[in-house]
């Protein structure tokens, strides 16, 4: 339903929460949002809920507040788990815990997280030795723990009051269904369940995976039935594929006082463009996070970006959900997201809590149909803007600069190649391939936007007919060295070993070939001596016979020399031979 909360409903909700929770809430928050009142009321009335609400609307508190009250009413023992919250990433889990913590401290409840990045044994030890009242977990890690200690987890979960699935639209893969089925087998059926997302939770059948019964639908929509906040302005810039990097950098340079978040398609892309951007943006604060960063590194980078006034963060989709940084001015998407719904989540990192924000996606000429696709499928309208300071000359100058950067360090050269490969692999898997297919992608242009010196061989590109348009660099890439002395020393050692092995292999092949030819000639010579024939011309037969005889003479000479060396011949015999 789409609704505005009236004063009576608001008053009733406040009364249901009780004074202790209200005391904590009123210290940190100004007022309740619609989604918090609507979903919270249903949960406190012991109904399951499916909640769709825009990013930045306060969805986390929408389940935290009723959850805390339900646990408070249940009067659990110190070791009883009263709530389980499943979220798709470590960052989201950390964000949720930070919201829960003040309320948990007030009620003397303990909160723990179970996510990837830690050893499973450590998680199991925590369950055995610690009291946990609220568990925040990623489904994959909880599934792993259940595989080891199902009885222990089932015993701990027997008092569960509420199951929350945060960012529920992300949980629609087959693997997740297997994980969810195992998790549900460990928790009581008599519980409440809440599904929360910024975009529509999938079909009715998908809800059965989560064990919902007669769920109440809560939909807090923005104008045009959009999942994006009304204070968010969405734009696109059309450019040639080979100019994307240049357009992105020029756009950032024009906005020296703005905080900007840029989404790239893969961890490899983030690593590569961080190296490029740090050499192109001067003293501008630059940060980077991706799924393969360590937890401490990610946390420190996110905090530093949050504290900055005009920082630039390069990221994968680990920053697309749940990371609450209120003052991001611009979100840039370097290319199409894997799923169109992710556009909404990415863009939702700006324009939070009523603040104005802007989102931009870089669209190559062959991708223009994506603009209408977003409007039709996600109700997101994009307006076109220009980047007037960019032109072909600047793009080529940047490409040459990027090449020099790669030549200065082999590690960056290799990072660029890996980034390009990951980009193509990611593009092949997005959900609008009917209108933006890999076959239509300007691969050569994309390679130039990465400033590649060589086009890597890829299965996805094996049938392309346009790759000969790529201008291969004359630079000998094998001579490019690592800037890191240890890496370069190791590379030289490996290259030397490979060269020696290659020489040995070639020598062995040559020896084998010569031995084979000798055996063949000897065999042919034997046939001629025995009066055999091969049906060849007389000249060829004579030549083969001559070679065979020469080979026999050579073998006789070798045997004779060996006998002389061993002293097997008398002086007279040696004289006769000579």
Swiss-Prot record:
One of its GO terms (molecular function) is ATP binding. GO terms for cellular component: nucleolus; P granule. A motif (Q motif) lies at residues 7-37. Residues 231-393 form the Helicase C-terminal domain. ATP binds at residues 53-60. InterPro entries: DEAD/DEAH_box_helicase_dom, Helicase_ATP-bd, Helicase_C-like, P-loop_NTPase, RNA-helicase_DEAD-box_CS, SPB4-like_CTE. Residues 510-526 have a biased composition (Basic residues). SMART domains: DEXDc (SM00487), DUF4217 (SM01178), HELICc (SM00490). Residues 536-549 have a biased composition (Basic and acidic residues). It holds the Pfam family Helicase_C. It catalyses: ATP + H2O = ADP + phosphate + H(+). A motif (DEAD box) lies at residues 166-169. It comes from the Eukaryota. It is an enzyme of class 3 (hydrolase). Residues 40-218 form the Helicase ATP-binding domain. Its EC number is 3.6.4.13. The Q motif is unique to and characteristic of the DEAD box family of RNA helicases and controls ATP binding and hydrolysis. Probable ATP-binding RNA helicase. Belongs to the DEAD box helicase family. DDX55/SPB4 subfamily. This is Probable ATP-dependent RNA helicase DDX55 homolog. It comes from Caenorhabditis elegans. The lineage of its organism: Eukaryota, Metazoa, Ecdysozoa, Nematoda, Chromadorea.
């Amino acid at each position: 339903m789409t609704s505005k909360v009236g004063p009576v409903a608001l008053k009733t909700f406040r009364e249901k929460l009780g004074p202790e929770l209200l005391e904590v809430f009123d210290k940190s928050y100004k007022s309740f949002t619609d989604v918090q009142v609507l979903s919270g009321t249903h949960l406190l009335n012991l109904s399951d809920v499916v909640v769709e609400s825009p990013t930045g609307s306060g969805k986390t508190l929408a389940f935290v507040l009723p959850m805390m009250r339900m646990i408070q009413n249940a009067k659990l023992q110190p070791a009883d788990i009263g709530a389980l919250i499943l979220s798709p990433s470590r960052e989201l889990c950390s964000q949720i815990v930070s919201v829960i913590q003040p309320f948990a401290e007030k009620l003397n409840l303990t909160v723990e997280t179970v996510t990837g990045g830690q050893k499973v044994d450590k998680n199991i030890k925590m369950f055995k030795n610690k009291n946990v009242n609220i568990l925040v977990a990623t489904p994959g890690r909880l599934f792993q723990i259940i595989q080891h200690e199902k009885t222990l987890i089932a015993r701990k979960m027997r008092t569960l009051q509420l199951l929350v699935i945060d960012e529920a639209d992300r949980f629609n893969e087959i693997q997740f269904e297997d994980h969810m089925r195992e998790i549900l087998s460990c928790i009581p059926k008599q519980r409440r369940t809440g599904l929360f997302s910024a975009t529509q939770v999938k079909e009715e059948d998908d809800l059965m995976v989560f064990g919902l019964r007669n769920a109440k639908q809560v939909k807090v929509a923005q104008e045009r039935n959009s999942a994006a906040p009304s204070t968010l302005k969405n734009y696109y810039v059309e450019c040639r594929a080979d100019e994307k990097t240049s357009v992105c950098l020029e756009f950032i340079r024009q906005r020296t006082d703005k905080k900007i978040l840029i989404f790239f398609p893969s961890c490899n892309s983030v690593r590569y463009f961080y190296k490029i951007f740090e050499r192109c943006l001067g003293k501008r604060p630059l940060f980077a996070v991706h799924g393969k960063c360590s937890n401490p590194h990610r946390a420190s980078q996110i905090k530093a970006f949050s504290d900055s006034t005009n920082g630039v963060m390069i990221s994968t989709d680990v920053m697309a959900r749940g990371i609450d940084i209120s003052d991001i001015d611009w979100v840039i998407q370097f290319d199409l997201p894997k799923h169109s719904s992710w556009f909404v989540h990415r863009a939702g990192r700006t324009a939070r809590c009523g603040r104005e924000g802007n989102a931009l996606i870089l669209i190559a000429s062959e991708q223009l149909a994506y603009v209408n696709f977003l409007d039709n499928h996600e109700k997101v309208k994009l307006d076109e803007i220009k980047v007037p300071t960019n032109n072909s000359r600047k793009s080529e100058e940047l490409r040459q600069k990027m090449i020099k950067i790669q030549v200065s360090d082999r590690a960056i050269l290799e990072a660029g190649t890996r980034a390009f490969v990951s980009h193509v692999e990611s593009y092949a898997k997005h959900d609008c391939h009917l209108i933006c297919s890999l076959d239509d992608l300007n691969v050569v242009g994309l390679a130039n936007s990465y400033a590649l010196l060589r086009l890597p061989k890829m299965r996805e590109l094996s049938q392309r007919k346009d790759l000969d348009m790529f201008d291969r660099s004359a630079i000998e890439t094998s001579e490019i060295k690592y800037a890191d002395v240890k890496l370069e020393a190791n590379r030289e050692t490996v290259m030397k070993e490979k060269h020696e092995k290659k020489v040995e292999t070639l020598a062995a092949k040559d020896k084998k070939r010569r031995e084979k030819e000798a055996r063949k000639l000897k065999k042919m010579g034997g046939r001629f001596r025995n009066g055999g024939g091969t049906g060849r011309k007389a000249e060829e037969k004579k030549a083969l016979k001559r070679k065979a005889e020469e080979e026999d003479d050579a073998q006789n000479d070798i045997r004779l020399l060996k006998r002389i060396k061993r002293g097997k011949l008398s002086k007279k015999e040696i004289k006769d031979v000579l």
